[in-house]
Each structure stands twice: as C-alpha cells, then as structure tokens.
Amino acid sequence: MITNIVITGCSTGIGIETAKYLKERMITVYPTAREQEDVNKLIELGFENALLLDVTKPETIANVIEKVLQKDGKIDVWFNNSGYGQMGAVEDIPTDVLREQFETNVFGLYEATTQVLKVFKKQGYGKLIQHSSVLGLVALPFRGAYNASKYAVEGLTDTLRLEFANTNIYPILLNTGPIKSDFRKNAIESLDKIDTENSDYKQKYQEAKSGNSKKVPFSLEADAVASIVHKIILAKKPAPRYYITKATYILGYAKRVLSTTLLDKLLLKV
C-alpha cells in the first residue's frame, strides 16, 4: 500500500518543495495551507489532495484528519512544518507578540500532534515529524521568541519519544539550519510587530530591513529537508533526530563540547 503524508505549512518554501519532492517519488501527499488561495494554488500545481489547515484553528486540523481517513483509512506520516520566526531583542518583544509566536510554533503544533496521535494509537503505528531548528539547539541574539518556541518543541518531542518508547509510533525532530526560502524575508517583516524606532537596537533593525545584515553561510536548497523527510518515510525505524545543513552540525557539536562561556563567544560571532 502506498505511503501517505500530511504536511502543514505548504504555501511556500520547505513545505511546498517537500510536497513536490515526495509526490515525484510516488508518496501520496496531503499538502495543507492556512489560506484558501494557497490551497487553490496547490491544486493548480497538481496536488488534488491539498487541504485547508490553520494550526491555530483546531477544527481545521480535525477536518483534515477526517478527510484523509475517509480517503485512505490511515495516516502514515504527519509533518508539522508550519511556523515562522519572530525577530527582535527579547526586551523589545511585547507579550502579545511572543504569545502569537507560540500560538503557531508551539500550541498549533501541539494541537496537531495530540490530534494525530489518537489516530496513530488506534492504528498502532505512525511517524510524527516535528520541524524544529538549529535554534532549538542553540540561541542567537534577536531570535529570542523563535528560540523559545523551538526549545519548547524540543522538550515536547523529547518527552513524547520517551512516552512512546517500544512502540511503532516515532516522534522525530528535524534540526534545520539556513535554507533558501522566504523564511528569512518573513522574519524581517515580523519586525513590523515591534517598536523598532524607540529601541536601543534601532540601527541593527534598520540593517536587517535594508538587507545589509550578515549573509547566512552554509545555506541549502529546500530539497535538503525534503530528502530527509523521504528518508524518514522509507526507514523502518527512523532516527529520533536529524541535523540538516552544516551549520546545524557545527553548532550542535559545539554545544556538546564547549563550555557555556565559550559557546556564547562563538554564537556572538555567528
């Protein structure tokens, strides 16, 4: 029987590229997006199984699960890919902006996770792929909200892995580094949600908005993530964690071997 996968956050970038990659390899893909306009675009691209899903609206998650089960009678893999990065110094981020970051990156992911786990438990198997980040391993300045959200995803998924040990249900973390997509552009646009004009970091924000900030090294194309997702689908027993991009390997290794003081010095140079 052909394997199927539900992917959240397929309007652009990693989500849509992963959907294309898997479809080309005969995986039944259910790409989702939170706006009907984007769902229509997916359908125009040949994804007849495209569905509307906004992780901040539990009823849309339930609707997708119901439709997939009606059509296939199972869900093999669920990829929680939705998310965005809120930029800004911690002191500049209003509580409601931090809360908004968590609504998508943490609470939305959590809602999708708990709903699909009920399906996995009933059918006795399933692979749950959680899109974390290199910033779920280490922190960077002006990424506090995003860092906090991904650290939360790490904690939830590490716990799930222990709770589902010795079963055929596999919670899996992707620690992705810099990928060529709209993610960084969207992160810079998120600065509009904070008061950059009256901040001590006004100049840094202006540099980010003007595109004059430091270029991101070791960036890969979105299919670097897609190929790992495909590897997970094919694996009988997938690894609990996958590093993607050299930056993740370098910083992940640095966190294991360096003291906190030395790691901080390294991260301030990134």
How would you label these PLM feature ranges?
Residues S11-T12:
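Conserved glycine-rich cofactor-binding loop
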Residues T113-T114, D158:
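A short, exposed helix-loop element centered on a Lys and neighboring polar residues
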Residues S133:
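Residue(s) in the substrate-gating loop at a strand-loop-helix junction
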Residues L53-N63, T95:
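The beta1-alpha1 cofactor-binding region of Rossmann-like NAD(H)/NADP(H)-dependent oxidoreductases
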Residues A165-K215:
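C-terminal beta-strand-loop-alpha-helix "lid" module of Rossmann-like NAD(P)-dependent dehydrogenases
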Residues T113, S149-A152:
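Active-site helix of classical SDR
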Residues A89-V90, V97-R99:
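Substrate-binding pocket helix/loop in short-chain dehydrogenase/reductase
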